[in-house]
Regions:
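Catalytic cores of phosphodiester-bond hydrolases, prominently lipid phosphodiesterases
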Residues: 62-340
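Primarily marks secretory-pathway-exposed extracellular/lumenal segments that are disulfide-
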Residues: 1-63
């Protein structure tokens, strides 16, 4: 007697598995695997070789520079080194002269050279009129018994108005202000409102990761503001720089005494200022030795020491008499250093 062989799908993993089948007939049908969503473009930075379906999340390396260098675009803000002018407004061009001056040329020359971080001091022109309209940039110490504006003052609406114009024209640059503030917080905010900078200010959450430069650019939050006013918390876009960062010593006696030890602030924070200017015997900024302090090789070597000490490059290289030496070139070279 001839017994017919039962043919069918004999694979238990198939949708049409036939447990009665004695011989596989090639008819097995298998379920479609669940899609794995991700970036399927091998040229993308976040290519996922496991992905089967593209979800539109592919990210590509920027080719247009951010702050002058394409490699900076995808770096977090705190991993970029910015050239910075100390008391940026206190210049001969702005009619503030020695001993109160820190530079010869004003904002426009600084910006054109590549400066993208600026230290500013806000004061009232006189104590008798502490109104918003009386805010000025002045360099001095009221504890000496006379107004900090005695040596001269700079109109902050004009100065910051120039900054706003340049930020608008350089859409790929992130700018930082560090403000030694001696006026009401609301008056400082009103000043930034007046010149059109407020909408650009980034708000950072303490101890969270800093965004990359391209993320700040895409958010159109291209201005980061630090200040010295820790008790004021109603203005979150003004970041207390001793809470959100730290600083090395400033106004050293000699370049040989410059180090990377924290002077003020929270050295557990990743943002820090490498202050890099000298004082003379009178305690004033020393223009006679600015070329020595601002020497490119010296600044890069010092930054390298800071990287070795703290595991990251300094966020700011802050100088006096920026026209001497080349802090912009030094910052560029520091940004090329490989950090473990």
């Amino acid at each position: 007697m001839i017994v017919d062989i039962v043919r069918g799908c004999t694979d238990e993993n198939a949708e049409n598995y036939n447990q009665s089948a004695e011989e596989d007939d090639g008819s097995c049908v298998y379920p479609e695997p669940d899609p794995v969503f991700g970036c399927t473009d091998p040229d993308a930075m976040n290519y996922d070789e496991e992905a089967t379906d593209d979800d539109g999340t592919c990210e590509y390396m920027e080719t247009i520079p951010c702050n002058g260098m394409a490699i900076l675009c995808h770096r977090p803000y705190d991993q970029v080194t910015f050239p910075e002018t100390h008391n940026a407004f206190s210049t001969h061009e702005d009619n503030i002269f020695y001993p109160a001056s820190n530079h010869r040329t004003g904002f426009q020359a600084q910006w054109n050279a590549g400066m993208r971080a600026f230290m500013l001091d806000t004061h009232y022109l006189n104590d008798a009129d502490q109104s918003a309209s009386n805010v000025r940039f002045c360099h001095g110490d009221s504890s000496r018994g006379f107004s900090p504006c005695t040596y001269g003052n700079v109109d902050p609406w004009v100065w910051l108005g120039k900054l706003e114009s340049e930020i608008q024209s350089e859409e790929r640059d992130i700018v930082t202000l560090l403000i030694e503030n001696h006026v009401e917080a609301d008056h400082l905010k009103a000043l930034l409102d007046d010149v059109g900078l407020s909408d650009m200010m980034y708000i950072h959450e303490l101890n969270s990761e800093w965004p990359t430069l391209i993320e700040l650019i895409n958010m159109d939050k291209r201005l980061v503001v630090f200040w010295e006013q820790p008790s004021e918390t109603s203005h979150p876009y003004f970041h207390d720089f001793l809470t959100f960062g730290w600083t090395t010593n400033y106004a050293d006696d000699s370049t040989s005494s410059m180090d990377c030890n924290p002077l003020r602030g929270d050295d557990s924070q990743p943002v820090y200022h490498m202050n890099n200017w000298l004082k003379n015997q009178a305690g004033l900024s020393d223009p006679t030795r600015s070329a020595e302090a601002n020497d490119v090789d010296f600044m890069v070597e010092r930054a390298q020491e800071c990287i070795e000490d703290h595991g990251k490059r300094p966020t700011f290289l802050a100088v006096d008499w920026w026209e001497d030496g080349d802090v912009v070139e030094a910052a560029r070279l520091v940004n090329l250093i490989e950090v473990p």
